[in-house]
Amino acid sequence: NRKGKAMPNPQDIFQLAQQTATQVTASPENWRRFLYTAAHNYHTTYLNQLLIHAQRPDATACATMKYWNEQAHRKVMYGSKSIIILQRYQGVPTAKRVFSMTDTVLTGDKAAAPWEVTDAIRPLLMQVNSVGSLMDRETEQGVSLSDRANRVLATSIEDSALNWSHPEDQRFILQEVAAQSTLYMICIRLG
């Protein structure tokens, strides 16, 4: 709200995400352009990836000004334009401003890279290496990630463009699109 700029209405922001979802799924080229944005903002939700893509398709590693200024050894440059995303606060969707890493400058000797392996996550990565897939591990609620993924797949198929295909093929097609999209994003990240 600085400089008297009011935050946009969460309903308007959600509508922008819906419009963007329609646009990015309209053609393979539009989807590839969206995947570029998603690959550089993989830490956030699909909804927020859509919002970032709609406002700044070239944005990378978007985070709040507080994160950049206080934790990442970076400062947001004066005059940088924020990107509006949605987050839930006590169950209510609220607008939140984030900035691309390209809108920041280094303030110290060492920058905290958003994708680097830190001591905090190293044990989890080692556990994944020794145990294999996390898909069969249970969450705090006693539900495996595989079960959760299956529920997400089922709800993603409902009311989607996959209605043209045979019901037995819908899940396979969606999984294939997700797998190919993930591989494409990995290739983008690897250069």
Region locations from a protein language model:
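N-terminal accessory/interface modules of nucleic-acid-binding and processing proteins
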Residues: 1-191
